[in-house]
């Protein structure tokens, strides 16, 4: 049988001599400073900013023509920070102080009379559309128009007949689309024939 033996006595610690690490002499120099261990205390860290590359701009050569771009007025220029000094140049814009001083104000006796309720009662809101059409040249004969439309049936958009081919805008067709032989009534379309002008000039010169 095999047994296990336990020794509870503490073994004395063997102190190993720490050998000093020497820096290897790569270049075979006689004197080499030993590497010193030093502590570096970091108090603050500054953000590293990379230098921005300057953008190359192509400046066109000055031409003899005048610029069509209107110059900027003083009010349209960008805001300037700091003390703004007056250069004494004329901006070409009317001064706002002129309106404050009363220039261009119409006297009260020359103002038009205000519109009262009597004027609104003469033309009610319901008749405003008819009044507008009368101002555009309409004679106001609604009875004749209604009489012409009494016998007609209201045609829905999907029931409307198609327009004839090659018919201009606003032109009326002479072909009755309701008839079955409507296509026979339409005359054949004659396309434009290209004429060679060189042959025509040669024929004219020979004659």
UniProtKB/Swiss-Prot annotation:
The keyword Acetylation does not apply. Residues 1-37, 68-121 are annotated as: Disordered. The keyword Hydrolase does not apply. It is found in: Nucleus. It comes from the Eukaryota. Belongs to the SPP2 family. Involved in spliceosome maturation and the first step of pre-mRNA splicing. Associated with the spliceosome. This is Pre-mRNA-splicing factor SPP2. It comes from Eremothecium gossypii (strain ATCC 10895 / CBS 109.51 / FGSC 9923 / NRRL Y-1056).
């Amino acid at each position: 049988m095999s047994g296990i033996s336990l020794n509870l006595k503490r073994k004395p610690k063997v102190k190993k001599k720490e050998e000093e690490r020497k820096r290897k002499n790569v270049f075979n120099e006689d004197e080499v400073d030993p590497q010193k261990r030093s502590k570096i205390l970091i108090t603050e860290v500054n953000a590293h900013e990379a230098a921005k590359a300057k953008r190359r701009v192509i400046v066109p050569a000055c031409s003899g023509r005048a610029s069509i771009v209107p110059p900027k007025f003083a009010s349209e220029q960008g805001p300037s920070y700091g003390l703004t000094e007056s250069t004494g140049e004329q901006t070409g814009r009317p001064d706002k102080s002129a309106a404050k001083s009363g220039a261009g104000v119409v006297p009260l006796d020359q103002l038009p009379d205000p519109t009262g309720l009597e004027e609104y009662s003469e033309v009610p809101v319901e008749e405003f559309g008819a009044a507008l059409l009368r101002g555009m040249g309409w004679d106001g004969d609604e009875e004749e128009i209604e009489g012409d439309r009494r016998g007609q049936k209201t045609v829905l958009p999907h029931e409307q007949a198609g327009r004839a081919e090659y018919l201009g805008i606003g032109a009326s067709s002479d072909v009755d689309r309701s008839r079955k032989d409507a296509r026979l009534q339409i005359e054949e379309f004659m396309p434009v024939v290209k004429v060679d002008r060189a042959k025509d000039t040669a024929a004219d010169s020979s004659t």
